[in-house]
């Protein structure tokens, strides 16, 4: 709690010192400028010679001009210190700037997310169409290979007449097997051992 109270007190003290510097520098500029104007006034002759008085006035004017320059530089340094104080200690403004930047970055992130989602959907649709095309062409080729040659050719070539394919197997008659007889052989009678047929008179 003491540290939290000390921080505002230090800020208040710093602001008071800035205010005092401002008033002192402005007063120094005004006083020195007023004295320069007074020095420029020609006075009556005194015990000091006019040449000596002129040199004295010239030196005084240089000193007061240097004081004005110093006060001006002090004011410029005060402006820089005030800017630094505001940048480092003006937390509401800093937080507001941070919030605005965060909102801009969130909006940019949402826009990028929307574009990425749209791109993903387009790629998914194109990939799905390519897969359908690929698998449909593959399945048609597989079905054609599983079918008989004539039917597969007929499916691949719609102009071909189906009757030609159906009549093609009938044109080639199957060859008989080498071991099986086509017809039953007639029985033969042997005349070597027995007598011939009886002749009637």
Curated annotation (Swiss-Prot):
<keyword id="KW-0804">Transcription</keyword>
<dbReference type="GO" id="GO:0006357">
    <property type="term" value="P:regulation of transcription by RNA polymerase II"/>
</dbReference>
<keyword id="KW-0010">Activator</keyword>
<keyword id="KW-0805">Transcription regulation</keyword>
<keyword id="KW-0539">Nucleus</keyword>
<dbReference type="GO" id="GO:0003712">
    <property type="term" value="F:transcription coregulator activity"/>
</dbReference>
<dbReference type="Pfam" id="PF06179">
    <property type="entry name" value="Med22"/>
</dbReference>
<feature type="region of interest" description="Disordered">
    <location>
        <begin position="166"/>
        <end position="201"/>
    </location>
</feature>
<dbReference type="GO" id="GO:0016592">
    <property type="term" value="C:mediator complex"/>
</dbReference>
<feature type="coiled-coil region">
    <location>
        <begin position="93"/>
        <end position="123"/>
    </location>
</feature>
<comment type="function">
    <text>Component of the Mediator complex, a coactivator involved in the regulated transcription of nearly all RNA polymerase II-dependent genes. Mediator functions as a bridge to convey information from gene-specific regulatory proteins to the basal RNA polymerase II transcription machinery. Mediator is recruited to promoters by direct interactions with regulatory proteins and serves as a scaffold for the assembly of a functional preinitiation complex with RNA polymerase II and the general transcription factors.</text>
</comment>
<comment type="subunit">
    <text>Component of the Mediator complex, which is composed of MED1, MED4, MED6, MED7, MED8, MED9, MED10, MED11, MED12, MED13, MED13L, MED14, MED15, MED16, MED17, MED18, MED19, MED20, MED21, MED22, MED23, MED24, MED25, MED26, MED27, MED29, MED30, MED31, CCNC, CDK8 and CDC2L6/CDK11. The MED12, MED13, CCNC and CDK8 subunits form a distinct module termed the CDK8 module. Mediator containing the CDK8 module is less active than Mediator lacking this module in supporting transcriptional activation.</text>
</comment>
<protein>
    <recommendedName>
        <fullName>Mediator of RNA polymerase II transcription subunit 22</fullName>
    </recommendedName>
</protein>
<dbReference type="InterPro" id="IPR009332">
    <property type="entry name" value="Med22"/>
</dbReference>
<keyword id="KW-0175">Coiled coil</keyword>
């Amino acid at each position: 709690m003491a540290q939290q109270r000390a921080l505002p007190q230090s800020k208040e003290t710093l602001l008071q010192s800035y205010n005092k510097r401002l008033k002192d520098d402005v007063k120094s500029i005004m006083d020195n400028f007023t004295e320069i104007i007074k020095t420029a006034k020609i006075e009556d002759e005194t015990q000091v010679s006019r040449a000596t008085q002129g040199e004295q006035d010239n030196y005084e004017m240089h000193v007061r001009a240097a004081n004005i320059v110093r006060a001006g530089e002090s004011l410029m340094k005060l402006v820089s210190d005030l800017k630094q104080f505001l940048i480092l200690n003006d937390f509401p403004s800093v937080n507001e700037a941070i919030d605005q930047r965060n909102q801009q970055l969130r909006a940019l992130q949402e826009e990028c997310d929307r574009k990425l989602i749209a791109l993903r959907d387009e790629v998914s649709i194109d990939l799905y169409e390519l897969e359908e095309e690929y698998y449909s062409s593959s399945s048609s080729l597989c079905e054609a290979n599983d079918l008989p040659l004539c039917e597969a050719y007929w499916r691949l070539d719609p102009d071909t007449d189906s009757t030609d394919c159906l009549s093609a197997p009938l044109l080639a008659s199957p060859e008989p097997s080498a071991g099986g007889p086509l017809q039953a052989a007639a029985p033969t009678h042997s005349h070597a051992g027995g007598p011939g047929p009886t002749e009637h008179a």
